[in-house]
Amino acid sequence: MSKITSSTLLKFKQEGKKFTALTAYDASFASAFDSEGVDVLLVGDSMGMVLQGHDDTLPVSVEDIAYHTRCVRRGIKRSLLISDMPFMSYATPEQAMRNATALMQAGANMVKVEGGHWLLETVTMLTERGIPVCAHLGLTPQSVHVFGGFKVQGRDADNAQRILDEAKALEAAGAQLLVVECIPAALAQTISEALTIPVIGIGAGAGTDGQILVMHDVLGISSGYIPRFSKNYLKQTGEIREAIRAYIDEVEKGVFPGSDHTFS
């Protein structure tokens, strides 16, 4: 199989082919996901909750992400590897440049940042210096305390328009991918149709170009709160690789996410 690049994902979008993404944190799981055909792997700051046992993602450090990026890189041959920029690691463009460089040197193909208009200068600076950027809008977990919890975003007209405007601005600033999380399905589809770059959804309906889930949710091994938008594929298959194949199949056929995993 050919390596997945941002150009591959753009081609998928242009052809109307849905693609899949999962979080990964070590070489063994990454190798399994890669060999089964998951297109994008994310070393997510979700590790703060699913690996480290915290209540949110805020305690995760750049060093944590870099370590797990190196682990995942050793396990993959095909998938595009994105690494999260953790909380307060990109508060200024200069800080973002330093920390993004560390993650790229650890093996990432792209870095992901959460935020809207305030990030435009940073996105442009990174991309102009050879660091591809994936933006993230909607429910941005690093802002959980600003939102007052993990809540659906963009339900009212003003916030929906703001998210759409920010998506367009981030694309213009140079972002090559966009993740939208926990927003109404109709808004996510509008954003996907308005942008040239691929849009990946999580809790955002089936109208996006790709889907991403946390691996612990897909395999039913998350402790504590289980998000409504997640689905335990291991429960219905009984084997990890079969679970991953089922996830890929349902995304490509438009079966997942269904109404049970979507917000209005």
Curated annotation (Swiss-Prot):
Gene Ontology cellular component annotations, sorted alphabetically: cytoplasm
Domain of life: Bacteria
Reaction it catalyzes: 3-methyl-2-oxobutanoate + (6R)-5,10-methylene-5,6,7,8-tetrahydrofolate + H2O = 2-dehydropantoate + (6S)-5,6,7,8-tetrahydrofolate
A biological process term (GO) from this entry: pantothenate biosynthetic process
Keywords: Cytoplasm, Magnesium, Metal-binding, Pantothenate biosynthesis, Transferase
Subcellular locations according to the entry: Cytoplasm
Binding site for Mg(2+): 45, 84, 114
Active site per database record: 181
Predominant location category: cytoplasm
InterPro entries tied to this protein: Pantoate_hydroxy_MeTrfase, Pyrv/PenolPyrv_kinase-like_dom, Pyrv_kinase-like_dom_sf
Pathway it works in: Cofactor biosynthesis; (R)-pantothenate biosynthesis; (R)-pantoate from 3-methyl-2-oxobutanoate: step 1/2
Free-text comment on the cofactor: Binds 1 Mg(2+) ion per subunit.
A Pfam family matched in the record: Pantoate_transf
EC numbers on record: 2.1.2.11
Residues binding 3-methyl-2-oxobutanoate: 45-46, 84, 112
Presence of keyword Lyase: no
MF (Gene Ontology): 3-methyl-2-oxobutanoate hydroxymethyltransferase activity; magnesium ion binding
Listed transmembrane segments: none
Cofactor(s) demanded: Mg(2+)
Record-linked NCBIfam families: panB, PRK00311.1
Subunit structure: Homodecamer; pentamer of dimers.
Family statement: Belongs to the PanB family.
Purpose of the protein: Catalyzes the reversible reaction in which hydroxymethyl group from 5,10-methylenetetrahydrofolate is transferred onto alpha-ketoisovalerate to form ketopantoate.
Official protein name in the record: 3-methyl-2-oxobutanoate hydroxymethyltransferase
Designated gene of the protein: panB
